[in-house]
Amino acid sequence: MRTRRAAIALLIAILALPVAAQRRVPKDLSGTRGFNYQSAETIGHAEFWLQYNPAVTERDLDYAKRLQLNQVRVFVPYAAWVRNKEAFRKNLLHFVRAAHERGIGVMPTMQYKFGEWKDKKAWPNSREFVADLVATIGKEPGLEIWDVENEPECCSLPPSPDNLLHMEHARYMARMFHELDPVTPVTIGATFVENMIAMGDAVDVLSFHNYSPTRAQIRANIAKAKQYAAQTGKPLIDTEIGCIARANPYDVTLQEHMQAHVGWYIWELMITGNWGTVHGVFYPDGTVRDPSIVAALLGFFRNRGENVVESVPDRENHVTDAVTKNRKWLAEAHPDWDTGLDLAEISANLIEAAQLAPMHNLPSRQVILMRNGQPDIAALRSLLEKFTAVLAPYRLPAGDPRHSRPPGFIQ
């Protein structure tokens, strides 16, 4: 009897708490290792949901799990929901549960009816959409945070009048989510730290984006965000980082955020038909754009210090040997196709292993494509000439001390 009375008393006490006190707000998000997501096979967030493929989702989440990622930010468009609400609910539920099974929490990021933010009278129209989302996944253990609006102030600093109206809409939506879901915390994905601060009182979790082009600027934005988070006592995350076209390399920005102990979400996991030219880690088959990104996600970074060991690809005369054999093949009137391919492969491997050329179009890839095609001696000759020109400057003259083991080597 005493146990039952105690349980009833506890329940009454919980119900008496203000709604904000019931909200499941994390104290610290510095351990967040997240990613933005849509499938590589689709273009745009609406198409992702309209052509949703559970097997593809599970494949990609398995890639994320292998990288020890623990959060996913996925856009949830009104346009996909309104087309087929029943299918959308089913697919969203599958996504959240599939992520949760892999230890990955979900941050749904809202996309409302196009242009609706411009008309205040239309703002309440989103209530049915939001209520349906809450009813569908609001009690799922895999749901972590609602991102009620992405970059409402994109992309002006200070905000333009339109930006300010859009930011007001984001605040309105934060209140709506707070009303309809008294448990799950909300955030707004701000483009700039300054605008995150301006909207900070409307959210439970502070979120900013950081595509800054220098380490100093990355650090300054992080410091400003951390200072405001400390003042308010609210947890902080950066929900978008990493872009090869904005001088914001993944390994650089990841290193800065990790060293600052700020949780992050890369944009994005997959190399997609939308942003794939400048973002993304994985191709659908599990191959990657750049292994340095994978290493950085796991906390391993390039040595950019004074103690870098110089690569000496000709230490054992393999570069000299390759250049000699290449030139001999090139001088033949009727060279052998297979022999030339082998020479090209050896040259490509030397170039890649010592990083002697840009890696955006791998030398080994060029050889593989040539092997898979029809014999074309002229094309192979051109490729081998190019590789030989790269290798030739790295030949060591006879007697160069770099041919030898370093001083102090113990036999």
Predicted features along the sequence, with ranges:
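Bacterial N-terminal signal peptides
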Residues: A9-P18
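N-terminal carbohydrate-binding accessory modules
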Residues: A21-Q71, R83, T187
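Short, well-ordered coil/turn segments that N-cap beta-strands
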Residues: L29-R33, Q68-N70, H100-V106, K139-E144, ...
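Short, acidic/polar
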Residues: W49-A64, N125-V134, A190-M196, I218-N221, ...
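Aromatic-lined substrate-binding rim segments of carbohydrate-active enzymes
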Residues: T57-G115, R127, L165-V183, P249-E256
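Active-site groove signature of glycoside hydrolases
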Residues: P77, Q111-W117, F129-P161, N195
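Extracellular glycoside hydrolase catalytic/binding regions
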Residues: G138, E153-T272, G276-A296
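Long, charged/polar, soluble alpha-helical segments
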Residues: R315-Q411
